[in-house]
Amino acid sequence: MAIMDFGGVKEEVVLRKEFPMSKARRVLKKETIAVIGYGVQGPGQSLNMKDNGFNVIVGQSKKYIKDWNRAKKDGWIPGKTLFDIEEACERATVIEMLVTDAAHQKIWPMIKKNLKPGDALFFSHGFSIVYKDQTKLIPPDDIDVIMVAPKGSGTSLRRNFLMGEGINSSFAVHQDATGRARERCIALGIAIGSGYLF
């Protein structure tokens, strides 16, 4: 892992060759990763993880039939790998919150009641956590809270993945309840198709 100086700001940069896919698979081998939301980031992240051999399921509200049908068209199978949001959360050890900020607030009570000690809550941006006094999204103390933020749309993430390339992503650990949050975070970053993480 390299430390790089960007205009006086030191950043740790993790390359795929330093944290290869085989290591990511070892770190996440016992995890069930639920991607919540099949809108902007959900398709790219979930399909990349699926293609990389991870145990991933999708949680999508049937009320948003366009997204539900898109998930089915992309090969997710209702009752097997495609569930309503609550059932996906019940089955998961890692919950990726890839819905909109407004939806974070709406579904948070359902997500929170399904979190188990040792689970990980994953975001692709930090608004809901940073402004928790406004969003009321306050995770329990016994879970990991992590972020991997691809520097591009879910479409770009998927396109680059299919071309054998990655997209740069930022990563952060907000809460480490298990002692494994950082390793899980980097592994998920590699799993979704990041070229390198910083």
Regions found by a protein language model. Give the residues of each.
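Residues at the starts of beta-strands that form the adenosine-phosphate
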Residues: 32, 54-57, 144
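Structural signal for hydrophobic packing residues in well-ordered secondary-structure cores
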Residues: 53, 103, 111, 115, ...
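Rossmann-fold dinucleotide-binding core
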Residues: 123-198
